[in-house]
């Protein structure tokens, strides 16, 4: 009897290409899939045209064009996102539609850093893309070695300016187009780039390993048994008899113990990240719990009202506002499972925010929510989405 082929489970990492328009992000993405398909195998090559023709997705009421490709190195399996337009990058990074554990910053060696290079680095810093690796593309168009040195220096300084370790970030030079056209020299550069990505971007901690958190979606009372809270477990694991805290929508936390876990009407010993579960809580009345609260491992989350955020405001064409908003604007902030009213304070020197803009400002909620850096939210008016954002700092 033939033995089953040994399939090693490689660790999975999410990455993407970022950088200025026409510096070669999509060409590089295609080149990576081609070179790795030929040299490592595992996933098929994707053409430039297939990647460039990005399908549209909806995330938090926003339409975003994104291409997803996958490829493998000897050590890892990668999911890679590439966006056709600048606005798609902004939306993608702000909504977290495509979570990135690290990104490849593509800089045209002929141009050097350009306005969107800077903007993408800033966005990566704001929304928490923790690691960047640089690919200096189009080196075949530059004869002057000193010019290449200068571009690398500029990129490193720019990274340092936005609090990335500019001196340590790996920088690889090559031509994605030449690699696509099977130039041995430039294929080697793609391999060198992927070695840098393998080594420099750490494997992320899986959601299951993080402290338990489940947003409350629904609450039921079961006669003789107590209160059941349902929701999708966002991270971590929960087991019978675990102590948990109920946090949000009020200043005080409540304590309880898990006395039952159900999924699809079957009882479980434990629930984990991604499960839609019903959790039976000891000593809690149905009236005490409401949507917008979270169940969490004790001591891991706290309720807050004041925060700083990075936000993308929908354009009129995307179904957003037709007019700008000003300091003191009061929308609903939709965190996890509920809307909370809040007001915004624009930074000094910013008069207003136009539809289609991305902006940084401070938000202030009327009720506390289990906020943390990196938490995504929608901004809504009368039940429809006018913006999407991410918490970049807690202020209270």
Swiss-Prot record:
Chain positions covered by the region annotation G2: 61-65
Region (G1) location: 19-26
Keywords recorded for this protein, A-Z: Cytoplasm, Elongation factor, GTP-binding, Hydrolase, Magnesium, Metal-binding, Nucleotide-binding, Protein biosynthesis
Lineage: superkingdom: Bacteria
Residues the entry annotates as binding Mg(2+): 26
Gene Ontology annotations for the cellular component aspect, listed alphabetically: cytosol
Region (G4): 137-140
The UniProt record lists the keyword Hydrolase: yes
Enzyme class label: hydrolase
Region G3, residue ranges: 82-85
Annotated stretches, region: G5: 175-177
Binding site for GTP: 19-26, 82-86, 137-140
Catalytic activity as recorded in UniProt: GTP + H2O = GDP + phosphate + H(+)
EC number: 3.6.5.3
GO molecular function list: GTP binding; GTPase activity; translation elongation factor activity
Major location category of this protein: cytoplasm
Compartment(s): Cytoplasm
Domain tr-type G as annotated: residue spans: 10-205
Presence of keyword Hydrolase: yes
Subunit structure: Monomer.
Purpose of the protein: GTP hydrolase that promotes the GTP-dependent binding of aminoacyl-tRNA to the A-site of ribosomes during protein biosynthesis.
Family assignment from sequence similarity: Belongs to the TRAFAC class translation factor GTPase superfamily. Classic translation factor GTPase family. EF-Tu/EF-1A subfamily.
Protein name: Elongation factor Tu
Species in which this protein is naturally found: Salinibacter ruber (strain DSM 13855 / M31)
Gene it is expressed from: tuf1
């Amino acid at each position: 009897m033939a033995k089953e082929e040994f399939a090693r489970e490689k660790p999975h990492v999410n990455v993407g290409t970022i950088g200025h328009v026409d510096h070669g992000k999509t060409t590089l993405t295609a080149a990576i899939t081609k070179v790795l398909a030929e040299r490592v195998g595992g996933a098929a090559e994707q053409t430039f045209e297939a990647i460039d023709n990005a399908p549209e997705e909806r995330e938090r009421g926003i339409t975003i064009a994104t291409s997803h490709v996958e490829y493998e190195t000897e050590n890892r399996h990668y999911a890679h996102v590439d966006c056709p337009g600048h606005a798609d990058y902004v939306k993608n990074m702000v909504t977290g539609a495509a979570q990135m554990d690290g990104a490849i910053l593509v800089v045209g060696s002929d141009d050097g850093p350009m306005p969107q290079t800077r903007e993408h680095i800033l966005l990566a810093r704001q929304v928490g893309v923790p690691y960047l690796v640089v690919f200096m593309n189009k080196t075949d168009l530059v004869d002057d070695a000193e010019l290449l040195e200068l571009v690398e220096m500029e990129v490193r300084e720019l990274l340092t300016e936005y609090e990335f370790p500019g001196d340590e970030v790996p920088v690889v030079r090559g031509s994605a187009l030449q690699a696509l056209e099977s130039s041995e020299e430039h294929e080697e550069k793609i391999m060198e780039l992927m070695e840098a990505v393998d080594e420099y971007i750490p494997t992320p901690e899986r959601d299951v390993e993080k402290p338990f958190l489940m947003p409350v979606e629904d609450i039921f009372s079961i006669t003789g048994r107590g209160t059941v809270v349902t929701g999708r477990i966002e991270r971590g694991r929960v087991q019978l008899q675990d102590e948990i805290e109920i946090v949000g929508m009020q200043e005080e936390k409540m304590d309880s113990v898990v006395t039952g876990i159900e999924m699809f009407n079957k009882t479980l010993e434990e629930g984990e990240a991604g499960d839609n579960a019903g959790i039976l809580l000891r000593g809690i009345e149905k009236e005490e719990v409401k949507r917008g609260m979270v169940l969490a491992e004790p001591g891991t989350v706290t309720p807050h009202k004041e925060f700083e955020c990075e936000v993308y405001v929908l354009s009129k064409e995307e179904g957003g506002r037709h007019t700008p908003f000003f300091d003191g604007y009061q929308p609903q902030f939709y965190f996890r499972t509920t809307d909370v009213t809040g007001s915004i304070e624009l930074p000094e020197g910013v008069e207003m925010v136009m539809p289609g803009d991305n902006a940084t400002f401070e938000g202030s909620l009327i009720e506390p929510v289990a906020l943390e850096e990196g938490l995504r939210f929608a901004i809504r008016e009368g039940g429809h989405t006018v913006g999407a954002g991410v918490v970049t700092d807690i202020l209270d």
